Regions:
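Residues that define the transmembrane beta-barrel architecture of outer-membrane proteins
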Residues: 1, 34-40, 56, 84-90, ...
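Residues on the lipid-exposed face of transmembrane beta-strands in outer-membrane beta-barrel proteins
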Residues: 1-5, 15, 42-46, 62, ...
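Outer-membrane beta-barrel channels and translocator barrels
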Residues: 8-10, 20, 49-53, 100-103, ...
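Transmembrane beta-strands of outer-membrane beta-barrel proteins
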Residues: 13-15, 42, 56-62, 90, ...
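Transmembrane beta-strands of outer-membrane beta-barrel pores
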Residues: 17-23, 48, 64-70, 98-102, ...
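Outer-membrane beta-barrel translocator domains and adjoining extracellular loop/strand segments
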Residues: 24-31, 70-78, 112, 117-126, ...
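Detector for outer-membrane/organellar transmembrane beta-barrel domains
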Residues: 79-171
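Outer membrane beta-barrel transmembrane domains
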Residues: 128-228
Length: 228
């Protein structure tokens, strides 16, 4: 569930409360499910210059994420699934777009900076106790285009890339360990359906292109406007 409020003509604030369902089946007798809220986020979006149709339209954004979902570092990993990241984080980014009627091209970049997750006491295999996690930073980039099939229907496609630095794990009565760096790529295919001059239903299917990306993701959004 997302809420967006226009503070000024070129400045808006938003919050997002995700509801997450996850399922994992390792064997016919070992199935795990989780249904809970995810990590709540608060953000802002600023457009310094009004679009004139000739030059690039630039927007800048930032957000703060609260670890309200089930932390992967506080659950029993053998019996439960997480619905959140487990740590506070902040991000900043930009987006650029331009209309080349009937094609609309866009791109974006971002940096993600998470804070450490400490005061942990999670038992891992071989009776190791996890006490702290220093997550890696992530850089993201996406490029795409949209095409208007008619006044009411459009389709879009984009490719998203991300690069994450190493995680560092701290163990009770042991030296720390690190995970490897990772890269991820996702192909997104979506559509927009205009149901009124101010309202468009959006759908998107994400297909993972690398082992570190989810196999498939699906999103569906319907905006609702409220005037205060």
């Amino acid at each position: 569930v997302g809420i967006k409020y226009a503070l000024l003509d070129n400045l808006s604030l938003s919050t997002n409360i995700p509801f997450v369902y996850k399922s994992d089946q390792r064997s016919t007798s070992n199935e795990r499910n989780a249904t809970d809220i995810g990590d709540i986020s608060f953000g802002g979006l600023w457009q310094p210059k009004k679009s004139d149709g000739r030059s690039l339209t630039m927007m800048y954004n930032s957000s703060i994420v609260i670890p309200s979902g089930a932390s992967p570092f506080k659950i029993d990993p053998d019996t439960a699934l997480s619905t959140g990241s487990g740590f506070y984080s902040t991000s900043a980014g930009f987006s650029a777009s331009k209309s080349l009627d009937p094609v609309f091209v866009f791109g974006s970049g971002s940096i993600y900076y998470p804070l450490n997750a400490s005061d942990l006491s999670q038992r891992r295999p071989n009776n190791r106790i996890l006490t702290k996690v220093a997550p890696g930073k992530t850089l993201g980039l996406s490029l795409g285009m949209a095409y208007a099939l008619s006044y009411t229907v459009s389709i879009n496609t984009s490719v998203s890339f991300s690069y994450a630095t190493k995680y560092k794990y701290y163990w009770e009565n042991e030296s720390s360990s690190t995970s490897g760096e990772s890269t991820s790529a996702v192909l997104n295919i979506g559509s927009g359906w205009r149901i009124s001059p101010q309202k468009t239903i959006s759908t998107s299917l994400g297909i993972g292109l690398t082992n570190s990306a989810s196999d498939f993701t699906f999103s569906f959004s319907i905006p609702f406007d409220f005037k205060l």
